[in-house]
């Protein structure tokens, strides 16, 4: 896995147990791709079953952006499998390197407050958070 400085800064923040990490930068600056690489690493190194949510303003935005990048990362690392991808629910399962645990990476849109209310998770990545209203953001946390 080829990693960028954005990846390294986010990894450092995760290791330091930062509760909130904000990435700012221009288009195509590797923010989304680097964070998705980090999500794969978190799932692989997990010492328990983890739930990781990847959220964006609309599902088409998510599908053409973060989800496409996530599949590409999994394929490049020979981790993608149809058996581990629930295309109906937009969920990917990733086995930990020790083989004992399986993390769930779920993709969903935040275009309805009913979709974001209540679910518990270990990690949350809001892609293009500036396009999400504050109430929805608050519900996601």
Regions flagged by a language model, labelled:
Residues 1-141:
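Phosphate/NTP-binding elements of NTP-utilizing enzymes
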